[in-house]
Amino acid sequence: MNKPLRNSHPLFKIANNALVDLPAPINISSWWNFGSLLGLCLIIQILTGLFLAMHYTADINLAFYSVNHICRDVNYGWLLRTLHANGASFFFICIYLHVGRGIYYGSYKFTPTWLIGVIILFLVMGTAFMGYVLPWGQMSFWGATVITNLLSAIPYLGMDLVQWLWGGFAVDNATLTRFFTFHFILPFIVLAMTMIHLLFLHQTGSNNPIGLNSNIDKIPFHPYFTFKDIVGFIVMIFILISLVLISPNLLGDPDNFIPANPLVTPAHIQPEWYFLFAYAILRSIPNKLGGVIALVLSIAILMILPFYNLSKFRGIQFYPINQVMFWSMLVTVILLTWIGARPVEEPYVLIGQILTVVYFLYYLVNPLITKWWDNLLN
């Protein structure tokens, strides 16, 4: 009997094993939709970004006006730009929910998949930061100045590293040009890393909401989960387009409508909303180098999760105290996001410091509580 083309063609076979005949656990919930939603976000960002790059000019005298030109003169340029800017917000919403799902259900036990995922998170954050600089508004310029300046905290190499990154003695034309270059290339690197992420995931198969081995009870990915994913696509695209058409600048910063001026500092420099929790952690450490280390650790600490796994069950579905701690940590991150947008004054500074300690404590106390709970049940 002849095999279907999808099983015999060397190229189609790869896609078939990843998207059609992939055995998937029968009980995975909507929390497992965010992986495919992230793929959709990445495709939207690459396509809209490609068309924006055709009309954008990476020059400090022209960048702001080229973005203005895109919005005013290019056919549907306003739509491309607002889709791209708000698409980034949706990308981060999906990433944070995806990571949160991974922490809750113990998906970090797939060590290589998890580590690649954290690297992808770092790459996406770098891409988004550089993209924010490109319109060359006030917040773009000052955000770039403040964040790149953090590298000067590195002992011995700091200042040289900053000047090398800037391509001069200040954020200038060379900085904008290289940021545009990296902003263009990084999404394709993210795409390649995503392939590796999936490759590692498909070695082990997906986790599921009860955290048990589901090999005896699996169903093909298509049609069951392809349709389930399409429902997720429709919901996300509906919300994204509603935001883009009703309030496209809701998540942006008003300061970025002012062309960059090195002589005027904005009253309150802050990044986009999806970086505010990390920015609050950075600001809560009085020492510059300490702040930079805390900033990097706020994401890098996710990498330690696979290595200190002490629990008998996968995930925290069966650990009530850990569930309370998990949701408390989520509230902590939301409060840190709020603090990051507040001015540097009391009581915000103290609240930020307390929340930072609580945030990092979660990763240290959580495995100990699971161990204690397991001993209690013995």
UniProtKB/Swiss-Prot annotation:
The cofactor named in the record is:
heme b
Cellular location(s): Mitochondrion inner membrane
Question: Which keywords does this Swiss-Prot/TrEMBL entry list?
Answer: Electron transport, Heme, Iron, Membrane, Metal-binding, Mitochondrion, Mitochondrion inner membrane, Respiratory chain, Transmembrane, Transmembrane helix, Transport, Ubiquinone
Q: PROSITE patterns per the record?
A: CYTB_CTER (PS51003), CYTB_NTER (PS51002)
Q: Which GO terms describe its cellular component?
A: membrane; mitochondrial inner membrane; respiratory chain complex III
Residues reported in the UniProt entry to bind heme b b562: H84, H183
Q: What is its main location?
A: mitochondrion
What InterPro entries does the record tag this protein with? Cyt_b/b6_C (IPR005798), Cyt_b/b6_C_sf (IPR036150), Cyt_b/b6_N (IPR005797), Cytb/b6-like_sf (IPR027387), Cytochrome_b (IPR030689), Cytochrome_b_C_euk/bac (IPR048260), Cytochrome_b_N_euk/bac (IPR048259), Di-haem_cyt_TM (IPR016174)
Query: Which residues are noted in the entry as a ubiquinone-binding?
Result: H202
Does the UniProt entry include the keyword Cytoplasm? no
Comment on bound cofactor: Binds 2 heme b groups non-covalently.
Please give the start and end residues of each transmembrane region. Answer: 34-54, 78-99, 114-134, 179-199, 227-247, 289-309, 321-341, 348-368
Q: How does it sit in the membrane?
A: Multi-pass membrane protein
The GO biological-process annotations, alphabetized, read as: mitochondrial electron transport, ubiquinol to cytochrome c; spermatogenesis
GO MF annotations in UniProt: metal ion binding; ubiquinol-cytochrome-c reductase activity
Residues recorded as binding heme b b566, renumbered to this chain, are H98, H197
Q: Which Pfam family is one of this chain's hits? A: Cytochrom_B_C
Query: Which additional comment does the entry carry?
Result: Heme 1 (or BL or b562) is low-potential and absorbs at about 562 nm, and heme 2 (or BH or b566) is high-potential and absorbs at about 566 nm.
Family to which this protein belongs: Belongs to the cytochrome b family.
Q: Tell me, what does this protein do in biology? A: Component of the ubiquinol-cytochrome c reductase complex (complex III or cytochrome b-c1 complex) that is part of the mitochondrial respiratory chain. The b-c1 complex mediates electron transfer from ubiquinol to cytochrome c. Contributes to the generation of a proton gradient across the mitochondrial membrane that is then used for ATP synthesis.
Subunit details: The main subunits of complex b-c1 are: cytochrome b, cytochrome c1 and the Rieske protein.
Q: From the Swiss-Prot or TrEMBL record, give the protein name.
A: Cytochrome b
Record the organism.
Drosophila melanogaster (Fruit fly)
